[in-house]
Amino acid sequence: MRYEEFLESFLASDKSLKETIKKVSGLEGKMQKDSVKGDIKSLLKNLDALKNAVSSLEEALTGVEESVSSFDYRTYFTSGEFTEDMLLGLKERKMDTVGEYPVFEVFPTRIRIDGENQEVILGKKKVPTMRPKILVDSAADLVDKLESAPFNAQAFAQDLENAYLICVLQEKAKNTGKVNDHLFYVPLLSCYKVMVPLSRSRKEYDEMAFAFDLARLYNEIKKGDFVTKSGHTCLFGTGRGKSVRILDDTGMEQLISTICFR
């Protein structure tokens, strides 16, 4: 059973429960008024009606319980149906999604599905839901929040250039005379490791966060005339080292692996 099918069934049984509770509450109110007015005949009549309503309440509650127990949420997770519904929802929202179970990249964040414990982690936080629609909505809200956050392209470019220069010096030390100072490309992930040397710091600023900052810098450079505070231009390259996947300002995937400042 898919979650939306379960939800439809549950809401129908819950509606019956809600209506019965409303009836019970109404009869109790009438009985209170009857007692105040001294209308014992009406009080006894409403008391009998309340007994019947309470019996109906038990039946309605049983219906809700049966509806909930009919949904095997563990199987829903482990069978892959939850993942299928989530991916369909992301596609309908036109959200860029790559990866395979249990980890999916929804740039610039990730969704991890823990089938064993029936849990979902969006970014770095657990999302207490088993309804794919709510997860997709939460992912969309997080992406919007990240994309609307302020970004200082100059400050990031300067940090990146500083790391780049350290990598160039390290390369020179290993390969004396073989480094072209004018046009030398350094793997982006080498720069990342220089920028974030401690493993515990990489938990706070991981490669995904780095890729997102690269994407925003990439888009800033696309506008033209971007130079660093030191007066250098920034060039991205491909083909050397592990690629970093980013999305440009049109939503197109770009794979970049190296960088050069000149």
Tell me what each language-model feature is.
Residues Y73-F77, K193-E204:
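Short helix-coil junctions and helix-kink-helix linkers
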Residues S138-D141, A155, D159, A209:
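Exposed alpha-helical structural elements
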Residues F71-E84, L88-R93, T97-F104, K172-V186, ...:
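Short glycine-rich, low-complexity/disordered patches
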Residues R202-I221:
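Short amphipathic alpha-helical interaction segments
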Residues P150-R200:
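Positively charged, polyanion-binding regions of nucleic-acid-associated proteins
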Residues R131-P132, N152, P187, D206:
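Alpha-helix initiation/capping motif
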Residues R216-R262:
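C-terminal engagement modules used by replication, chromatin/transcription, nuclear envelope/ESCRT
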Residues M1-P150:
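Long, compositionally biased intrinsically disordered regions
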